[in-house]
Amino acid sequence: MIMEKGMNSGEGLPSRSSQASAAKVTVKELETQQPCKEKRGGFVLVHAGAGYHSESKAKEYKHVCKRACQKAIEKLQAGALATDAVAAALVELEDSPFTNAGIGSNLNLLGEIECDASIMDGKSLNFGAVGALSGIKNPVSVAHRLLCEGQKGKLSAGRIPPCFLVGEGAYRWAVDHGIPSCPPSTMTTRFSLAAFKRNKRKLELAERVETDFIQLKRRRQSSAKENDSGTLDTVGAVVVDHEGNVAAAVSSGGLALKHPGRVGQAALYGCGCWAENTGAQNPYSTAVSTSGCGEHLVRTILARECSHALQAEDAHQALLETMQNKFISSPFLACEDGVLGGVIVLRSCRCSSESDSSQDKQTLLVEFLWSHTTESMCVGYMSAQDGKAKTHISRLPPGAVAGQSVAIEGGVCRLESPVN
């Protein structure tokens, strides 16, 4: 598929709604020929959040995306399942103090960390998730374990295994299944604590004093950009392995100063992530991971909407229309001034390899895209043949309005795959 270029041209794509203006951005096509030798193949695309990423921290965001890609590819090359690889990428993202997931997550109103995470397997369609989880360093590890335990079948006495646990119940289940706990204080960083104190002061001031709304709004926006506290940086990843199986995962610390017990899109089915292998009614395997304002993503079930849209012939156009019509212009968000979110998507299909006449190999065509309505989104991607991951911070062009405009970029990767 040939996609158009024009990153900073400012030329607009035709809007499908009076509420949405779409910004045309560069889409690079990458052609990667991957030989199947001793190491297995695969591809990973990760994101470190949609929101606002300051130039001063761009290096850190790109670095953690690069490490996450490398961890996933190491798993894929060793023959691991797509779910294992996507979980490995998320653990790396959660361990970074610069992301709002795991260590360094946003603090809630009580100054505590409560995390959400989920993972979905495109082959079995099984799903695992945790919400408002405290005391566990890597929430995605609990979600992954829930998925794996669920695939084993029913529990004793015919009980249905859980796929989604929250709060204290999720914590106890994790510890009972050998996942180590950690003191909550070890997950708080000086950055997250400073942001909490700063945001708490703003909240207390707003509650005590009636002030000019415009002036307050400008002050908040300025502070957010200076301190990078305006990011809605849920992290996520999508993976396809050498057999063509896909998986997706997402993890988040949630909104700053959220109410204790609040669960966002990162834990909810069809909202935070989605993965589905090709089937009788699906010509493409698809995987999606979202980021942004959790309430906006929940009310639009954006991950599943994007996955279904990607069954259309033109993935680029299908994703653009979904972001415009199903997100920005969604009737479920009609009262919102600006709709903030981002997605990474991957779709794959098998086709005959022109360079290899062997009957036991096919080319796995992988199309990958990212799109956002926020000011920026940080992504990284890598195939099993690549020596290192590529990273990029996508930004809306000058003049585009966050919450009302759409940026979209992506590429294509070709992998050699064994025939099932």
Swiss-Prot record:
Phenotype when the gene is knocked out: Tasp1-null mice are born with no apparent respiratory distress, but the majority dies at postpartum day 1 or 2 with no obvious milk spots, suggesting a feeding defect. Newborns are smaller in size compared to their wild-type littermates. This phenotype appears in utero. Animals that survive the newborn period are markedly smaller through adulthood, and display skeletal abnormalities.
One GO BP annotation of this record: positive regulation of DNA-templated transcription
GO cellular component: cytosol
EC number(s) per entry: 3.4.25.-
Keywords: Hydrolase, Protease, Threonine protease, Zymogen
Presence of the UniProt keyword Protease in the record: yes
Any one GO molecular-function label of the UniProt entry: identical protein binding
Pfam families the record matches: Asparaginase_2
CDD domains attached to this UniProt entry: Taspase1_like
Sequence segments annotated as region (Disordered): 1-25
Record text on subunit structure and interactions: Intramolecular proteolysis generates 2 subunits, alpha and beta, which reassemble through a non-covalent association to form the fully active enzyme.
Record's function text: Protease responsible for KMT2A/MLL1 and KMT2D/MLL2 processing and activation. Through substrate activation, it controls the expression of HOXA genes, and the expression of key cell cycle regulators including CCNA1, CCNB1, CCNE1 and CDKN2A.
Family classification: Belongs to the Ntn-hydrolase family.
Protein name stated in the entry: Threonine aspartase 1
Species in which this protein is naturally found: Mus musculus (Mouse)
Lineage: Eukaryota, Metazoa, Chordata, Craniata, Vertebrata
